């Protein structure tokens, strides 16, 4: 089967159900990484994923991994308990550092290319891409970044260079996000790391229904302002 080659001049994606089954979710190629195209993609359950130097590829896998409710183990509850946790956390205080560290820490993986970093930093400046930082004193030791789509947060990548740093980031962020009216975290494709925190696979159509609901919700003003998360 063939996939659609997108024009750079027209922002238009095929419907997600047109995606291939093998490789799972491959929907289209080409286009660009402009903020307008990226936002349309995420609003329709589509995300870019490609190796540096290769054509841009767009995906919408079925099933889709989603964190509906974070599962926190007893050991992690003890680890992040106030007064015991060695880390402090912040929101949108070091986006560029987080995404560039995600890129450099993924040994053998080159999908967070220089073009991706540039595009998502632009989305951050527009208030649509966000980061969570984990600090050990003044050193950045973990973090994650993603895109906000109404009451859904579309997670892109995370990194950790200290014990439980990325797990702690996701747990702390999920608690904050849901307190502010957030509903779900899109994890795209299930892996062992997100599964242990409660992520599960749901049919793509169910995910798209959640995404539609999420876009009907407006979060309170100031939710994404740079701030300490504890």
Curated annotation (Swiss-Prot):
Domain of life: Bacteria
Alphabetized InterPro entries for the sequence: Acyl_CoA_acyltransferase (IPR016181), Leu/Phe-tRNA_Trfase (IPR004616), Leu/Phe-tRNA_Trfase_C (IPR042203), Leu/Phe-tRNA_Trfase_N (IPR042221)
Enzyme Commission identifier(s): 2.3.2.6
Record's keyword annotation contains Cytoplasm: yes
Reaction(s) this enzyme catalyzes, per UniProt: N-terminal L-lysyl-[protein] + L-leucyl-tRNA(Leu) = N-terminal L-leucyl-L-lysyl-[protein] + tRNA(Leu) + H(+); N-terminal L-arginyl-[protein] + L-leucyl-tRNA(Leu) = N-terminal L-leucyl-L-arginyl-[protein] + tRNA(Leu) + H(+); L-phenylalanyl-tRNA(Phe) + an N-terminal L-alpha-aminoacyl-[protein] = an N-terminal L-phenylalanyl-L-alpha-aminoacyl-[protein] + tRNA(Phe)
Compartment annotation: Cytoplasm
Family: Belongs to the L/F-transferase family.
Protein's job: Functions in the N-end rule pathway of protein degradation where it conjugates Leu, Phe and, less efficiently, Met from aminoacyl-tRNAs to the N-termini of proteins containing an N-terminal arginine or lysine.
Protein name, UniProt field: Leucyl/phenylalanyl-tRNA--protein transferase
Gene: aat
